């Protein structure tokens, strides 16, 4: 399941291109993912409680189907992606200009994501476009939440579990 199809963020990227604003990628290159999976030093970046939240989010995001021995490597990839995006944000800084990071909710969380990799002197604000009334966004520390109409309920995990194994949507 492609969580970030181009159609979801194309309007933001294309508006920036049309306005002549530089657009840069910030994700961790695929070539560095295997090394990140094995980099246990990443485990120390977050406090233990936050690392536990990140583990839960990764497990849930993979529909509970990730084998236990693959969970921490996937958490490390998430942490490495956040670090890579933070470096891209810092590298894009220009005096008097704003840097906009377009990323998923897990990456913009102040307690788990990219902001944890930014230096203390760096001022950042978080805006979330939220479909419906998801408690995670409402309870987040975002500076701004832009509400959009709720999406139709869908079990995104059903295709991963296989035919006949769908669970009711909550």
Regions found by a protein language model. Give the residues of each.
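Glycine-rich anion-binding loop/nest that anchors nucleotide
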Residues: 73, 77, 96-107, 125-128
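C-terminal regions of proteins
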Residues: 84-93, 107-170
């Amino acid at each position: 399941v492609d969580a970030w199809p181009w159609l979801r963020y194309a309007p933001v990227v294309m508006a920036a291109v049309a306005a002549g604003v530089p657009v840069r990628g910030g994700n961790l290159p695929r070539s560095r993912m295997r090394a990140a999976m094995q980099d246990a030093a990443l485990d120390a970046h977050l406090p233990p409680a936050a690392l536990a939240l990140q583990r839960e989010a990764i497990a849930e995001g993979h529909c509970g189907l990730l084998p236990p021995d693959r969970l921490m490597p996937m958490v490390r990839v998430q942490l490495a992606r956040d670090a890579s995006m933070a470096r891209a944000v810092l590298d894009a800084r220009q005096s008097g200009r704003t840097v906009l990071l377009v990323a998923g909710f897990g990456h913009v969380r102040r307690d788990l994501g990219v902001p944890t990799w930014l230096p203390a002197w760096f001022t950042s604000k978080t805006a979330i476009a939220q479909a419906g009334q998801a408690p995670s966004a409402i309870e987040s520390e975002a500076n701004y939440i832009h509400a959009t109409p709720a999406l139709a309920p869908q079990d995104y995990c059903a295709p991963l579990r296989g035919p006949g194994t769908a669970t009711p949507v909550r």
